[in-house]
Regions:
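Periplasmic alpha-helical coiled-coil/stalk elements that build and connect Gram-negative outer-membrane
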Residues: 153-272, 381, 385-388, 426-428, ...
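C-terminal structured "cap/appendage" subdomains that terminate the fold
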Residues: 402-442
């Protein structure tokens, strides 16, 4: 007898003790989600891409300077000519374009007196009709900046939705954990009921039907316990995904009793919702985009008329210094114009822009009404959840008292176990209903904050 005991003790010593699962609070999960949520990381990458693209577009309005070197050899005389210099241009945001070029040419071995020559050209172009509106020239820069702003709002929207997602998943897991605890208690009571019913059946005070009823109740409780356990693991996986946690990380949670912000009054929440919801602000800016599109389309319908101011000079000499000195400068001014005979494409572009503007304005009005309706719907659900919780709490107390009375009567032999099973099922349903309504209040308050645009991220991240 001693050897098996020693062997069992040795096995217990050799088995490593698993460390306790860490407890992740809602604040810790939210902070992890803000840093590692895959969907949020994707939109952050899109924001960085938009910022880089904006820098690229802005660089097109900076001076563009390109040095060059070229060599050419004549086929007839086999004489080589070297040319080097630079070209420069700059497009100003108000539409003016400046182009310049400076070239120095050298003919090695040329017997002429001046083997070096230079050429200078500076051209200033100003649109006078088509494209004279500065909005035409600045449109690429404006669109790039709008893309950055739009992506910033997308990030803010997804951050708020991530808070909602984490809370829904976290509270869902907390609900299933509590349901699992209730199912375990119910299973334990059902097991005791089955044992007591069998004992009374053997004593002859109960029928076989009572034993079968108790066994069925025990099986039902075990099924509920199994379902709750599986739901806990499913929601644990969802929480891992939402927070960017490791797929095998084991953890426990602590259900929050409150949320860090208080929802405003319904009237206050509906007032000014368009100024607080990023979706509404973005829709308003899309109207501005369409207005710019119409403005540009009208400008492009005008005939092309450009004023051109040109400065030219040349130089020559026996050395580089002499050749670089400009001689015979000329200054000329002229007009350049063109207009296509088929203006249908430009007309169609203007009409498309005008129709798109009407659509954006109509959609914004619908969005305004939808956001107000969303606020009202969220507050109705909060009122309903609060009312349901009051009823569910009272119902749970009555159901508990009924179950206790039925159990007491059964233990004293005053009744069979039918009333016990019935009262037990009612009590279990009442407790789950009270649990659901309690969690529904927290989720409804979050929906009120989100719908009113008052869901601020920092207070949620500062939770312990």
């Amino acid at each position: 007898m001693v050897a098996p005991l020693l062997l069992g003790a040795t096995n217990d010593i050799q088995q490593p003790r698993l460390p306790p699962e860490p407890v992740l609070t809602i604040g810790e999960v939210l902070r992890a989600a803000m840093e590692r949520n895959p969907d949020l990381l994707n939109v952050l990458d899109a924001l960085r891409t938009a910022r880089v693209a904006e820098l690229g577009v802005a660089s097109t309005f900076l001076p563009q300077v390109s040095p060059f070197y070229a060599t050419d050899r004549s086929r007839d005389s086999s004489q080589r000519t070297d040319s080097y210099g630079l070209t420069a241009s700059e497009l100003f945001p108000f539409g003016t374009r400046l182009d310049g070029a400076a070239t120095l040419t050298r003919v090695p071995g040329d017997p002429v007196e001046n083997p070096y020559g230079s050429d200078y050209r500076l051209t200033l172009t100003q649109p006078l009709l088509r494209g004279a509106d500065p909005a035409v020239t600045r449109e690429p820069l404006r669109q790039a900046h709008r893309s950055t702003i739009s992506n910033q709002r997308t990030v803010e929207i997804l951050r708020r939705r991530t808070v909602l997602l984490v809370y829904q998943t976290y509270l869902g897991m907390a609900r299933q954990q509590e349901a699992l605890r209730l199912a375990a208690e119910r299973s334990e009571r059902s097991t005791k009921l089955t044992e007591f019913s069998r004992a009374r059946f053997q004593a002859g005070s109960l029928s076989r039907l009572d034993v079968l009823r108790a066994e069925q109740q025990e099986a039902s409780a075990e099924l509920a316990r199994s379902d709750a356990s599986i739901s806990v693991e499913d929601l644990r996986d969802d929480l891992r995904r939402a927070a960017g946690l490791g797929r095998d990380l084991r953890f426990r949670i602590r259900s929050p009793e409150e949320i860090p912000l208080i929802e405003p009054d319904e009237r206050e929440a509906a007032a000014g919702v368009l100024d607080r919801r990023p979706e509404a602000i973005e829709a308003r800016d899309q109207i501005t985009d369409s207005e710019f599109a119409v403005r540009i389309a009208k400008s492009l319908q005008l005939p092309s008329l450009d004023g051109v101011l040109t400065y030219e000079a040349i130089g020559a000499g026996p050395s580089t210094g002499d050749a670089l000195r400009p001689r015979n400068p000329t200054l000329s001014f002229g007009l350049r114009s063109q207009y296509g005979l088929n203006a249908t494409v430009l007309y169609a572009q203007r009409r498309e822009a005008e129709i798109a503007l009407e659509t954006q304005r109509r959609n914004f009005q619908v969005l305004e009404e939808d956001l107000v309706r969303e606020v009202r719907r969220a507050y109705r659900r909060l009122t309903q959840a609060t009312h349901d919780h009051e009823i569910a709490a009272r119902n749970a107390e009555v159901a508990q008292l009924q179950a206790q009375v039925a159990q007491l009567r059964f233990e004293k032999g005053l009744s069979d176990n039918f009333n016990v099973v019935d009262a037990e099922n009612l009590w279990n349903s009442a407790r789950l209903l009270e649990l659901d309504s309690r969690i529904a209040i927290l989720l409804a308050r979050l929906d009120c904050l989100f719908a009113s645009g008052r869901l601020e991220i920092p207070p949620f991240l500062q939770q312990r």
